[in-house]
Amino acid sequence: MKYISLSSGSCGNCHYITGRDTKIVIDAGISGKRAIEHLAMHGQSMDGLDAILVTHEHIDHIQAVGILSRKFNAPVYATEKTWENMKRHVGKIKEENVRVFRRGETLGIKNIEVGTFEISHDAVEPVGYTLTQGNQKISVVTDIGHVS
């Protein structure tokens, strides 16, 4: 797997992970244009994007979720409470592209297994993710403020 941080910090968070034939964005808290341009600087494209995973509902994590979902017909994964608190900010997303899960649930996105886990943050139901493909693992944890 390959990990690219497109942006991190209070100005916006956006992470891109690719593995074999799978493309995943974790958080899209920058403009869609900026995310696409930053990824292109790394020689990558979001064409064929398989999933957008959301850690929590703060705007610096969801700004372009709707734009990227619509442009690339990508499903958006979020916990139920996160989805309920973010849906009015992301615009219209196809019903079949809304994927709600419970913290602790394991998701399958093509050939990548995605573990979800609770994190500490001032959001309604924040999560971190561990992506596993073969013997490779990448974990993404944001905005925790302390090691838990």
Task: Explain the meaning of each model-derived region.
Residues S7, A51, R99-R102:
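Beta-strand->loop->alpha-helix junctions that form or flank phosphate-binding loops
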Residues G32, I62, M86, P126, ...:
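Short, well-ordered alpha-helical microsegments
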Residues I4-L6, C11-C14, E57-H61, V65, ...:
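Structured catalytic core of nucleotide-sugar glycosyltransferases
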Residues L53, G115, V140:
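Conserved Rossmann-like nucleotide-binding pocket used by diverse enzymes
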Residues M1-H42, V127-D143:
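Conserved beta-strand hairpin/beta-sheet module of binuclear metal-dependent hydrolase folds
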Residues E80-N135:
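Metallo-beta-lactamase
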Residues G32-T79:
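Active-site metal-binding motif and surrounding structural segment of the metallo-beta-lactamase
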Residues S7-S8, A28-I30, E57, K81, ...:
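Active-site metal-binding loops of divalent metal-dependent hydrolases
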